[in-house]
UniProtKB/Swiss-Prot annotation:
SMART domains recorded: MAGE, MAGE_N
Keywords: Tumor antigen
Domain MAGE positions: 112-311
InterPro entries the record matches: MAGE, MAGE_N, MAGE_WH1, MAGE_WH2, MHD_dom
Physiological role: Not known, though may play a role in embryonal development and tumor transformation or aspects of tumor progression.
Entry protein name: Melanoma-associated antigen 8
Organism encoding this protein: Homo sapiens
Tissue: Expressed in many tumors of several types, such as melanoma, head and neck squamous cell carcinoma, lung carcinoma and breast carcinoma, but not in normal tissues except for testis and placenta.
A GO CC term attached to the entry: nucleus
């Protein structure tokens, strides 16, 4: 799991009880086995919608569906329920000169997954320039010949935005199908005003806030770095999206009052720990963050930074 095992969840509950928020924890909904199974397919799609970001921040142009296999890795055929019967019947028949239905289905799924990736990049660009977006715009600029599949494409792109970037896609005009993009959980921070303005950092901030809760509302520094390393984020290693991660955690988010970074009381040798800062406490709640963490754990069991890199990989081609 991204944020630890059951023992860590118990520690979080224990810590929250001490702070008077224990009743709220009981409201956190843990996904059922069926929901987790469906989420597994969703996480595979999220991984498939993303491509790498160059160190210079200059994304490459989009690929055609035929050439998308290098950036679109879809291993679960249930993602797009197309031609299942045709695939099985073809296997029963002998060699044929007609196109392989399974191969055609795979190409079709890859094309749809690429549309999800394109829509994520389109929505990120809209968020960066603070513009609303309409269904008509998405159909014309991104979906094009896949209009019949818009509901599925839009749903999966919205999930990527929420789970990975910490951005909610909210409908504000049902009649006109108009949407706005806002940061999740009431947080007012997105990180676009810092050194790296290419991508919102709200998603990672929420994850770190969740890690702190999992450690009982105060997290030893080494526990945070260990959890981040599981996600492919390492102390002392610069990253194309987060640049200097230590600076982000111990300086930027501390200056923004989302985190406290202090010497652990009574530690010898000296050790440091992270706590929620006053701005995090004012803007969101333990329960909201834990609910978000549960959704992330259910949906994204893969390398976290690769999601950001791949989603931004072809942003210039939007």
């Amino acid at each position: 799991m991204l944020l630890g095992q059951k023992s860590q969840r118990y520690k979080a509950e224990e810590g929250l009880q001490a702070q008077g928020e224990a009743p709220g924890l009981m409201d956190v909904q843990i996904p059922t086995a069926e929901e987790q199974k469906a989420a597994s397919s969703s996480s595979t799609l999220i991984m498939g919608t993303l491509e790498e970001v160059t160190d210079s921040g200059s994304p490459s142009p989009p690929q055609s569906p035929e050439g998308a296999s290098s950036s679109l890795t879809v291993t679960d055929s249930t993602l797009w329920s197309q031609s299942d019967e045709g695939s099985s019947s073809n296997e029963e028949e002998g060699p044929s000169t007609s196109p392989d239905p399974a191969h055609l289905e795979s190409l079709f799924r890859e094309a749809l997954d690429e549309k999800v990736a394109e829509l994520v990049r389109f929505l990120l660009r809209k968020y960066q320039i603070k513009e609303p977006v309409t269904k008509a715009e998405m159909l014309e600029s991104v979906i094009k010949n896949y209009k019949n599949h818009f509901p599925d494409i839009f749903s999966k792109a919205s999930e990527c935005m929420q789970v990975i970037f910490g951005i909610d896609v909210k409908e504000v005009d049902p009649a006109g199908h108009s949407y706005i993009l806002v940061t999740c959980l009431g947080l007012s921070y997105d990180g676009l005003l810092g050194d790296d303005q290419s991508t919102p950092k709200t998603g990672l901030l929420i994850i770190v806030l969740g890690m702190i809760l999992m450690e009982g509302s105060r997290a030893p520094e080494e526990a945070i770095w260990e959890a981040l390393s599981v996600m492919g984020l390492y102390d002392g290693r610069e990253h194309s999206v987060y640049w200097k991660l230590r600076k982000l955690l111990t300086q930027e988010w501390v200056q923004e009052n989302y985190l406290e970074y202090r010497q652990a009381p009574g530690s010898d040798p000296v050790r440091y720990e992270f706590l929620w800062g006053p701005r995090a406490l004012a803007e969101t709640s333990y329960v909201k963050v834990l609910e978000h963490v549960v959704r992330v754990n259910a949906r994204v069991r893969i390398s976290y930074p690769s999601l950001h890199e791949e989603a931004l990989g072809e942003e210039k081609g939007v």
